[in-house]
């Protein structure tokens, strides 16, 4: 494969909003960016004599002028008198966002519920999905706000993530919210993928809770086997049936998993990568994880489906 030349990247570090690039003496930086609900991570290996950071302080990273993320310091690991590592994450796991709570969201839309959770935890929101104005009754019993967000996303077939101070929700099948990248396979440092057949469910059963009758009921789409069975926070049969239909529709009988590495590029997880192969055929994939490795060079690696 043809490979472009490596160049030393221009890295800028903002610490609690102040440019501390000249005081941030690092030898290696790794940034992990996920498409789903996993927390993005920033890891920097620092020279031993560098000033020690404080837990929960904020780090923003720019490479070659591109903003690559905002993170909260969550751990410091020491290799005595040699170096120390700073680990920072996009979600503060010691905050109220991850602590268990008990409450009821009554007569509120999904959008209002998400906005209330965001406001309580100091986040902004980016919300755009078909059912966001649907009024619901949602019970939060011994669950964290993050778990509630995950449940809403799972039940409504949404893409959900916490990035750069935002709670982001949109329909998983809505491509208008996803960036499209284009890359020639021959210009990649490495590219590998696997194809395999996957079982396709012919029917779907959704177990939902009826508040009117105070018991669980089952809504089903399809009559054939095999059957996908799920439990949902849906509160009526019509929304449970819509969920079942969405789950069946989202299935794929051919599963593709792959990865590639390229010269450092400001790609982000959740985007589409359109890869042009040597037979002039272009295939579109969803990037599920991006890893940026920065030292004297900048390498970008990705996982896709």
Report each predicted region and the residues it spans:
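Assembly/oligomerization scaffold segments
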Residues: 1-95
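Short, compositionally biased
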Residues: 74-82, 172-176, 284-297
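Short beta-strand-centered interaction patches in the first periplasmic/extracellular domains
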Residues: 2, 83, 90-92, 127-197
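An acidic/polar, Gly/Ser/Thr-rich interaction patch typically located in mid-to-C-terminal regions
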Residues: 25-52, 189-305
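Short peripheral tails and domain-boundary helices/loops at the edges of structured domains
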Residues: 79-84, 91-101, 292-305
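Conserved "cap/hinge" positions at secondary-structure junctions
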Residues: 63, 171, 277-279
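Amphipathic, non-transmembrane alpha-helical segments in extracytoplasmic/periplasmic proteins
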Residues: 44, 88, 102-126, 140-163, ...
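Sec-dependent N-terminal signal peptides of Gram-negative outer-membrane/periplasmic proteins
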Residues: 76, 99-101, 125, 134-135
């Amino acid at each position: 494969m043809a490979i472009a030349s490596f160049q030393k990247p221009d890295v800028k570090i903002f610490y609690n909003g102040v440019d501390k690039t000249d005081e941030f003496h690092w030898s290696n930086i790794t940034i992990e960016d996920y498409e789903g609900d996993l927390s993005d991570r920033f890891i920097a290996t620092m020279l031993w004599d560098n000033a020690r950071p404080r837990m929960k302080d904020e780090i923003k990273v720019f490479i070659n002028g591109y903003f690559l993320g905002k993170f909260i310091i969550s751990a410091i690991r020491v290799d005595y008198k040699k170096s120390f590592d700073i680990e920072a994450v996009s979600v503060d796991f010691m905050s109220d966002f991850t602590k268990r709570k008990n409450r009821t969201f009554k007569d509120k839309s999904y959008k209002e519920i998400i906005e209330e959770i965001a406001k309580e935890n100091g986040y902004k929101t980016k919300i755009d999905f078909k059912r966001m104005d649907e009024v619901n009754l949602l019970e939060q019993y011994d669950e964290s706000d993050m778990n509630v967000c995950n449940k809403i996303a799972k039940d409504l077939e949404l893409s959900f993530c916490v990035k750069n101070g935002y709670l982001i929700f949109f329909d998983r099948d809505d491509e208008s919210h996803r960036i499209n990248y284009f890359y020639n396979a021959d210009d990649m440092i490495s590219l590998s993928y696997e194809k395999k057949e996957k079982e396709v469910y012919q029917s779907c059963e959704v177990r939902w809770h009826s508040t009117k009758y105070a018991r669980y009921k089952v809504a089903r789409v399809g009559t054939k086997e095999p059957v996908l069975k799920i439990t949902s926070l849906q509160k009526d049969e019509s929304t449970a049936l819509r969920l079942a239909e969405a789950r069946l529709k989202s299935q794929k009988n051919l599963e593709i998993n792959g990865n590639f590495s390229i010269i450092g590029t400001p790609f982000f997880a959740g985007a589409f990568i359109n890869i042009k192969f040597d037979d002039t055929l272009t295939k579109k994939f969803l990037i599920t994880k991006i890893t940026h490795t920065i030292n004297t060079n900048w390498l970008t690696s990705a996982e896709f489906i």
